[in-house]
Amino acid sequence: AASPQKRAASPRKSPKKSPRKSPKKKSPRKRKARSAAHPPVIDMITAAIAAQKERRGSSVAKIQSYIAAKYRCDINALNPHIRRALKNQVKSGALKQVSGVGATGRFRVGAVKRSAASANKLKATREKARARAKAKKAKAAARRKAAAAKRKAAAAKRRAAKKARKAKAKP
């Protein structure tokens, strides 16, 4: 029996090492701000209170049920936002707390008070705006008149040139 031939040991080729590439720097991802499917909580609360027209004010439970029904949002997720908004609005005077403390009890829409100084400022700014509008209208009218005069002059010039050409052509 013939013995199997031994192969000559071939020199092993080592795998080529590719030159090391510097790791790519990842640019920070810009997250798009997702817009909520509902208006701001403050607006929803004021709408709820206004819609219920309760004489003694609207309770937090009623406000929440109105928001859940009208805007179809998860009330459990909005609860902390509603509570914070109620407290802040009471503090600012936009809402009036009829009974209870903090974010509990009954709430009504508060009367927004304007000081005399702010009312005067508002009047002054309105008057300035009116004056500006009048000045703009006057300027525009003057421009229109000037443009019309230019057009008329150009047309007259053209007519005169045409007459002169006809007169030259006749003799």
UniProtKB/Swiss-Prot annotation:
<keyword id="KW-0158">Chromosome</keyword>
<feature type="region of interest" description="Disordered">
    <location>
        <begin position="1"/>
        <end position="40"/>
    </location>
</feature>
<dbReference type="GO" id="GO:0005634">
    <property type="term" value="C:nucleus"/>
</dbReference>
<dbReference type="Pfam" id="PF00538">
    <property type="entry name" value="Linker_histone"/>
</dbReference>
<dbReference type="InterPro" id="IPR036388">
    <property type="entry name" value="WH-like_DNA-bd_sf"/>
</dbReference>
<keyword id="KW-0238">DNA-binding</keyword>
<comment type="function">
    <text>Histones H1 are necessary for the condensation of nucleosome chains into higher-order structures.</text>
</comment>
<dbReference type="GO" id="GO:0003677">
    <property type="term" value="F:DNA binding"/>
</dbReference>
<feature type="domain" description="H15">
    <location>
        <begin position="37"/>
        <end position="111"/>
    </location>
</feature>
<dbReference type="GO" id="GO:0000786">
    <property type="term" value="C:nucleosome"/>
</dbReference>
<comment type="similarity">
    <text>Belongs to the histone H1/H5 family.</text>
</comment>
<dbReference type="GO" id="GO:0030527">
    <property type="term" value="F:structural constituent of chromatin"/>
</dbReference>
<protein>
    <recommendedName>
        <fullName>Histone H1, gonadal</fullName>
    </recommendedName>
</protein>
<keyword id="KW-0539">Nucleus</keyword>
<dbReference type="InterPro" id="IPR005819">
    <property type="entry name" value="H1/H5"/>
</dbReference>
<feature type="compositionally biased region" description="Basic residues">
    <location>
        <begin position="9"/>
        <end position="35"/>
    </location>
</feature>
<dbReference type="InterPro" id="IPR005818">
    <property type="entry name" value="Histone_H1/H5_H15"/>
</dbReference>
<dbReference type="InterPro" id="IPR036390">
    <property type="entry name" value="WH_DNA-bd_sf"/>
</dbReference>
<dbReference type="GO" id="GO:0006334">
    <property type="term" value="P:nucleosome assembly"/>
</dbReference>
<feature type="region of interest" description="Disordered">
    <location>
        <begin position="133"/>
        <end position="171"/>
    </location>
</feature>
